[in-house]
Amino acid sequence: MKKFLFWIFFVGFLCVGCENVQLSVENQSSDIKQLSSSYVGKKVSFACWNVQTFFDAKTDGTEYDEFKKSDSWNSGKYCKRLERLCEVMKSLNSDVIVLEEIESISVVQDISNYLVDGKWDKSKNWNYVCFARNKGTSIGCAVFSRYPVKKLLIHNLDIRVQKVKQPSCRPLMQVTINIDEKDLVLFVNHWKSKSGGEIETEIWRDWQEALLGERLVCDFSFSEKNAYVLCGDFNRSVEDFVCNFDRKPECTDANVALRAFGHEKSNFVCVYSPWFDFSTEKGSYFYNGNWERIDNIFSFGSLKISEFMVESDGKLVKEDGSPFKYSIYNGEGYSDHFPLVCNLLL
C-alpha cells in the first residue's frame, strides 16, 4: 500500500481526514447522470493551474535532476518565483484555486505567507488550504480556498493485473468544500505523464480515469445533491476522451464520458467539459509545436460552469502566444501551462 502525505490547515491549524483506496470493480445501483437545471445559484470563481515543477531551494533528494544539479537554483530565485506566483494568484482572484506540481507542504506554507503579506483580510485571503503528495515522490497538488474545507480523501492506484509493474502515479485528491451550507466536491488530478511513450503509458491514464469515475459514482450515490468539479492536468487532451456531442438523454448537458467501473447501466459516467462550448483558445499547453488541452475542468451533479477561459494574457505569455515557461537558469518565466478559469454556479 502506498504511503502518502496530506494536510488540511487553516492558517497553521492542522486537521485531516483520509482514505487510501485500491481500485476495485463492484456493482453500484445508482442511476448516474449529469443533472440538467435552469437554476442559477451561488457563483464561485474557480481556477486550475499547473505551475511547472515548483520546488523550494532546499534539497530533499526527491527533486527533479535539473534542480538538484543546477548551481543557478538558489533561495533568491525561489523567493522571486514565489512573488510571481502570488501575483498571478491575486490577479486571478478566484475563490478556489487548484495548483499542480507543488513540491511540499513547506512550499504551500510559503505561498500562503506571501499571499497574506502581513495583511489580514478574511474576505480576500485564501484561509483554507490542503495538499497531498505520495511519500518519496517529487510533486503534489494543493487547493487554496476562501471557503471552509470540510474533508480531504486520498485515493491511490494499486494495479497488479498488468504485465508490467505499475509506475509511480500521483494520488487523486477528493476535497469537500462547504459553500453556504452546500458541498462542492473537487476531484483533483495529475495523471501519468507521457514520458516513456504516449502509447506505452496510456494504460495507466486509463486506470486513473477508471479510479476517478468509480470514486465519482460512489460519492454521488450517497450525496446526489452535491456539486462536483473534476480538474487538473490529465496529460490527455479533452478530444482524446470518449466524447458525446449528440447530448443523448442519458447524458443531458454532458459531452464527455469517463470510464467508471461499477456503473450498473454502463461502464461510463457522463460529465461536462466547457472546452467545446465556451473557449475559442487552441489550448493551455504548447508542446513540440502543437497546442494541447490536457488541462481540464469537468462538471457533474448540481453544478453549471460559466465564463470558462484560458488565462493567456499579460506576463504569462511569450510573444509567439505560447506559455512563458519558467527557466531555472535565468529565473525568468512562469509556467509551461496557462491557468484555466471559470465560474461555478452552485
Give the label of every model feature segment.
Residues 19-118, 128, 133-136, 326, ...:
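N-terminal, active-site-proximal structural segment of metallo-dependent hydrolase catalytic domains
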Residues 19-33, 167, 214-229, 235-346:
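Metal-dependent phosphoester-hydrolase catalytic domains
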Residues 1-4, 233:
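Positively charged n-region of N-terminal signal peptides that target proteins for export
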Residues 60, 179-210, 214:
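Metal-dependent phosphoester/phosphodiester hydrolase catalytic core
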Residues 102-191:
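Structured beta-strand-rich core segments of catalytic domains in phosphoester-bond hydrolases
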Residues 51-54, 102, 191, 233-234, ...:
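Active-site metal-binding loops of divalent metal-dependent hydrolases
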Residues 15-17:
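C-terminal motif of bacterial Sec signal peptides marking the signal peptidase cleavage site
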Residues 4-13:
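Sec-dependent N-terminal signal peptides
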